[in-house]
Amino acid sequence: MASANTRRVGDGAGGAFQPYLDSLRQELQQRDPTLLSVAVALLAVLLTLVFWKFIWSRKSSQRAVLFVGLCDSGKTLLFVRLLTGQYRDTQTSITDSSAIYKVNNNRGNSLTLIDLPGHESLRFQLLDRFKSSARAVVFVVDSAAFQREVKDVAEFLYQVLIDSMALKNSPSLLIACNKQDIAMAKSAKLIQQQLEKELNTLRVTRSAAPSTLDSSSTAPAQLGKKGKEFEFSQLPLKVEFLECSAKGGRGDTGSADIQDLEKWLAKIA
């Protein structure tokens, strides 16, 4: 399909310049046939460079990394730690915040980090606004409160996955299991397993809902493979899990445990 589209684009461009190309070809043939071969080769190289510049510019325009999650998951403190390296008291936000993040990968790359409110009345509205520009989504989970919030987390994540799969260029997705400094925090492995179970139940419920009542009716009918228990590995987009702690193991004065998150951001930049 891609080669056919390329041929159509090339045919259209060639048609527009055909009289000029014919005239140039005749003049070159009269002077020296070798010049014709050189001119054709140069033209092919030029068109290739223009094509790849267009493709790269589209990719480069997707520089946003969206931080999403339930209220009190710690995503705003993660956002602040990445940008400043410092601890700061945060409160539940009602507006989005964005800032340029310099990626530490020795290539001078940067990303735009966008912290989206976790309040239920705002989260989907703002996600819709920014998702088309997202290179990646960081879904932050409160590992200490996960056991009692698992259903709410799964419902939010379900919609994030559905929205991401519906995009032409699906973003990378990271599940950041935050607050690992708390003794009762669940591991990333356990969180992944429980989310797979909850999402498996959710997709059955959503697929059985009447289309007129299902807000995601224009998206794929279900996640994963039909007839099989849901696993993140079945999705067309890559989903990764890691453990982190925005607060750190020594309280407010300690350094954050976000090295794995920083490495992941450098990888997708």
From Swiss-Prot:
Highest taxon listed in the record's lineage: Eukaryota
One Pfam assignment: SRPRB
Annotated binding of GTP, by residue: 69-77, 90-93, 118, 178-181, 246
GO cellular component: cytoplasmic microtubule; membrane; signal recognition particle receptor complex
Signal sequence residues: none
Principal subcellular localization: endoplasmic reticulum
GO molecular-function terms, A-Z: GTP binding
Residues modified to Phosphothreonine: 212
Regions that span the bilayer: 35-55
Protein's cellular compartments: Endoplasmic reticulum membrane
Record bears the keyword Heme: no
Keywords annotated in UniProt: Endoplasmic reticulum, GTP-binding, Membrane, Nucleotide-binding, Phosphoprotein, Receptor, Transmembrane, Transmembrane helix
Gene Ontology annotations of biological process type: SRP-dependent cotranslational protein targeting to membrane, signal sequence recognition
Positions of modified residues (Phosphoserine): 110
UniProt membrane topology term: Single-pass membrane protein
Family: Belongs to the SRP receptor beta subunit family.
Described purpose of this protein according to its UniProt entry: Component of the SRP (signal recognition particle) receptor. Ensures, in conjunction with the signal recognition particle, the correct targeting of the nascent secretory proteins to the endoplasmic reticulum membrane system. May mediate the membrane association of SR.
Subunit and partners: Heterodimer with SRPRA.
Listed name of the protein: Signal recognition particle receptor subunit beta
Organism: Mus musculus
